[in-house]
Amino acid sequence: MKSIIFFTNTFVIIFILNINSVRADFTAKVQRVVDGDTVHVIDKAGKKFKVRLTGIDAPEKNQPYGLAATYKLTEILINKLVLLKSKPNNGKPYTIDRYKRVLAKIILDGKDINLSQVLRGYAWHFKRYQKQQSPSDRELYSEAEIDAKKNELGLWEEKNPIAPWKWRKMKK
């Protein structure tokens, strides 16, 4: 009897852990690029979402390189069918931030678009939220930022670019 209870409890724990690690992936068409890390999409059922690209923080539009980051993301994503990868949270199949945006990694043709924004120097790796990333993504995004900086790509052409989170504080 004890062994049955033990195995039942073990199964329940494993099941709960697996549910929490499942990612809610869905496809949607990009309708609008708001800025270098936010897009509007519509899914196959016609539901519209605002999506915040996880793991990165792009310059604000009125900040140096903000328009370039927005333009580059538009060039790549506008009217494209993409895969959105998000984590289930609070009973929803995806995570939503305080601005009611779905937090997601965007995949286009197998390529991580969030990471490519960092690689090209159009965004910082948003280390404040890196614990929400997988260890491999954390490492990839961090290395991408180091490489972009070393190669003076995009915003790293400037000697000391101001990070968006600092820019927003200064503008309040």
Predicted ranges, named:
Residues 2-11, 16-172:
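Small beta-barrel nucleic-acid-binding modules, primarily SNase/OB-fold domains
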